[in-house]
């Protein structure tokens, strides 16, 4: 895609004229208004990283409201909230109570403390196969279907940390039992 000289900017995120109305609603542009650098950054952080990447990430490690297109991840405030029967019975509704997410954070911390060198490798995989791909692909605001599969490598890296959390928790429990503090 080639920009007119007056339209060149660093990090052009809102680029496809076919999606002008969607860009307008997300960024808050007026009709015919061109996005500024700050609005392009807002679109990248709010929509591309926030909605497109983090929502998919949290679907896998926190829970998912439903399998409807555009469904959000299941936040703690929604765990026990009464929802309509159609939503409650939706087979795509998953409530993990954020257990995998918390385990991943524990595993991340455990690996950082125990093995900083290999932590760097897994963290690099996590970033390069997640947020860096979001940055590189510059996806449009609408997709014909959910595209969470493009971030699968990032999810694998986070799954490593979930596994390491189990080892870390086991070590803590076994040291408590050995020292007779139970």
For the regions a protein language model found, what residue spans apply to each?
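Lumenal/periplasmic acceptor-binding loop at the mouth of the active site in multi-pass
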Residues: 1-108
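Transmembrane alpha-helix segments characteristic
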Residues: 96-103, 114-137
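Hydrophobic alpha-helical transmembrane segments
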Residues: 109-113
């Amino acid at each position: 895609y080639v920009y007119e000289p007056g339209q060149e900017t660093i990090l052009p995120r809102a680029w496809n004229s076919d999606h002008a109305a969607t860009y307008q609603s997300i960024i808050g542009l007026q009709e015919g208004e061109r996005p500024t650098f700050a609005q392009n950054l807002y679109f990248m952080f709010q929509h591309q990283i926030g909605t497109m990447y983090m929502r998919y990430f949290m679907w896998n490690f926190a829970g998912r409201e439903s399998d409807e297109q555009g469904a959000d991840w299941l936040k703690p405030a929604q765990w026990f909230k009464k929802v309509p029967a159609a939503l409650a019975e939706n087979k795509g509704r998953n409530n993990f109570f954020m257990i995998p997410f918390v385990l991943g954070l524990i595993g991340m911390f455990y690996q950082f403390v125990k093995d900083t060198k290999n932590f760097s490798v897994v963290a690099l995989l996590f970033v390069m196969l997640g947020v860096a791909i979001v940055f590189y692909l510059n996806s449009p605001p609408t997709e014909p279907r959910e595209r969470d599969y493009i971030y699968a490598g990032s999810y694998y890296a986070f799954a490593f940390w979930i596994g390491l959390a189990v080892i870390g928790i086991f070590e803590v429990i076994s040291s408590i039992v050995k020292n007779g503090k139970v």
